[in-house]
């Protein structure tokens, strides 16, 4: 049975990191991931993902903050999506209404649902 890993915020970033570490996860749901984290952009440029499917999401107001590091979230999620696509990963990026703290359970559920839909009917447990 295919495994899916996912999470919200820092757990979303961990899920993305895991996608670069192992092929044990056929799909990853990185919901509002902390891609603004120091050197994450450098890391993804130097590594290849090992998963087949990645769901990304971000609130459309998350970059509207006084914190200069958090303001980079929108640009970095776009760069993350582009990098995954360049590497041949089936990737979607969904923009949600609101900031980082709105509807996190529903957003995460949508991510796992998307992953399950991508894996429906696939028999091999690893990519």
Predicted regions: what is each one?
Residues 38-40, 64-66, 103-105:
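Extracytoplasmic/secreted cell-surface and envelope-processing proteins
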Residues 1-49:
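Primarily recognizes the serine-hydrolase "nucleophile elbow" in alpha/beta-hydrolase
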Residues 63-75:
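Short, flexible/disordered intra-domain loops and linkers
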